From Swiss-Prot:
SUPFAM superfamilies: Kelch motif (SSF117281)
Annotated F-box domain residues: 17-63
A Pfam family assignment: Kelch_FKB95
Protein name: Putative F-box/kelch-repeat protein At2g29860
Length: 240
């Protein structure tokens, strides 16, 4: 709870008609920083000054410094071929739980590879009548997005993983040693291939169904078919 009291002798202390938009932004920031983010859309309607503070990067820095962190789940949901995948957010609000679509983010390609670093979500590749190499970065603070440099190869249902601050993307294309793995440097925002050997067990299209990152290793699971039977196998990349 935030308590406000009149400060006598101030420039507006004797003015009972002072509007919220006349409050200093530093004061507004101190007011809204401890308040849960679910109330920010309503608070942003109070005035232009409130809206400016709530959408500023400084408020995120202030909240982080004060230890106000709220767990938020982002869901990438779609039903191919009927609907293209969209981003949804599940968060606690003034009602217990609410799943809300993020209309500020564009449609995503089915089969895209997704990783998170800090407050940024990286969406790589997918399928748009054919595999694509598109890379999108989402800023979870403001739910804005922009394109990054494309991957060197188009990939669909690839296995991604973050190790030591670098993004590895594995498979998702016709298997060949030359470009089975590539890595993205988030500092220079550039891609390069990683010399490796394709697993003999992988399917020709190199599609993975799930993956995990554990102790410096990226493990991808793919399905294989043999005489009308489907079974699972896995392949791992160890990054030293």
């Amino acid at each position: 709870m935030v308590l406000l009291s009149e400060i006598p002798g101030g420039s507006n202390g004797d003015d009972p008609n002072m509007n919220p938009q006349e409050l200093p932004e530093e004061l507004i920031e101190s007011i809204v920083a401890p308040i849960p983010r679910c109330y920010y859309p309503s608070l942003s309607l109070l005035s232009r000054a409130f809206r400016h503070v709530i959408t500023s990067q400084q408020l995120f820095v202030t909240r982080s410094g004060l230890g106000f962190k709220e767990p938020v789940l982002y869901a990438f949901i779609g039903c191919t071929p009927y609907t293209t995948p969209r981003w949804f957010i599940l968060r606690r609000s003034n009602i217990p739980l609410q799943l809300r679509r993020l209309n500020s983010l564009p449609h995503m390609f089915p089969g895209a590879a997704v990783v998170t670093i800090g407050y940024k979500i990286y969406v790589m590749g997918g399928y748009n009548y054919q595999p694509v190499s598109t890379v999108i970065i989402i800023d979870c603070r403001f739910h804005t997005w922009h394109y990054l440099q494309d991957m060197q190869r188009a990939r669909y249902h690839a296995t991604p993983g973050v190790i030591d601050g670098r993004i590895y993307v594995i498979g998702g294309r016709k298997k060949q040693d030359a470009d089975w793995v590539e890595v993205f440097d988030v500092t220079t925002e550039s891609w390069e291939t990683v010399p490796t050997q394709c697993p003999n067990e992988a399917s020709e299209n190199g599609l993975f169904v799930t993956y995990a990152v554990m102790q410096g290793r990226i493990l991808g699971v793919f399905l294989l078919t043999n005489q009308d039977k489907v079974y699972g196998s896995h392949w791992e990349l160890y990054v030293s």
